Amino acid sequence: MRAIIATMCALGLTTAAVGAVPSHFQPRAQELLADSIQLEPTANHLNVIYFVGNDREPLADYERRISELLIYVQQFYGKEMARNGLGNRSFGLVLKENGNVNIILIRGEKPHTHYAYGTGHNDCLREVNAYLDKHPELRTSQHNFVIMPTHYDEKYNDLNPGGVPFYGLGTNCFALDYGHFDIRHLGQRTHEGRLLTKWFGGFAHELGHGLNLPHNDGTASQNAQMGTPLMEAGNYTFGYSPTYMTLASCRILANSEVFAPAGCTTRFYTNTTPPAVYASNFKRVGDTLEVYLELESNVVNVNAYVQDPPFQVNQDYDAVAFPCVMSRTHEGKTGAFAHIPLAELAELKKVYDGTIALDILIQTNEGSRFRWRVPFNLSQVPADGTIDMGTPTLHYGY
């Protein structure tokens, strides 16, 4: 790490989390970033990559535009971490001397049409990793944020961007760039403003996936007070109407590689062996569900999510999140307790209609995540009844 930092300094780069808003940022960016908070320095940083096919060039002024947008998102994450009591922490960014984000430009081996939405990520990631292997001083974490210009053809253009990968895959995520992808349109009641909310909201949302976040919703009372969670439908509200991050999301981020504080030497995501579950209890107490787990001592965070069907990928936006209260038992095990008032599930449509699920996300001290799904039928559980959790079956990742 010291060698990488020394190389970065020689290249005129800095790992500072935030400083004064760069003077060359446009007035709208200056305005939106005027209330920036001082973020804690991080040990690791997001690899930001601008990837173009061999028949395309980057879009005009992409470095300034993407920098303004990314720093705004970094601030949003940091302010939400602080609001949730986890400190002024956000994902680290490597900055150039002029304050722009260090965006790594990679030119693909094939034409831009090869890197299309459905499967284009495969060769893109192969080429990205090959490039970073040749330039290890540029790889500052395992998290890659890949941005591609929209396809310009008979279907896609600046008024209807698309055609490129736009999703999260493990520690990688993809977003797009287009001519009007500019923070000056944020919150504007114009076509460009509405378009920016969609694609900039998606930019922030897919980045969340690349930083280990699953879809999740807030409770009924939280949503009434704060708006829409970013990892629910916040990609359609970001910058336009109140959008927030749940405590469950922020607790996952607190144990993610690019949020690790300066000086941290943890090797992240190395443990793929599920932690032991020593005890589990799931019961209904009147109008509340209660979950208690005793787990291996390396567990540092547990979230409980209640979801109605369907349970397939991208059908979990409405999974209501309940972060567990964490404790340490006399035997040195990790205790986790979730209190789930049924009234807070009011936005779920099928709570009492057949099988729903309790999803448990378990996070270890080096950031690895494991999921355990417990299907149950609430309508068949008496007011003070116990729900069978079955044999613990933990799956790595999410």
What are these regions (language model features)?
Residues 158-185:
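A structural motif
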Residues 21-144, 148-165, 312, 321-333, ...:
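Propeptide-to-catalytic entry region of secreted or membrane-anchored zinc metalloproteases
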Residues 1-4:
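Positively charged n-region of N-terminal signal peptides that target proteins for export
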Residues 6-15:
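Bacterial N-terminal signal peptides
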Residues 388-398:
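Compositionally biased low-complexity segments at domain edges in trafficked proteins
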Residues 197-215:
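Active-site recognition of the HExxH zinc-binding catalytic motif
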Residues 180-203:
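Short pre-active-site segment immediately N-terminal to the catalytic Zn-binding motif
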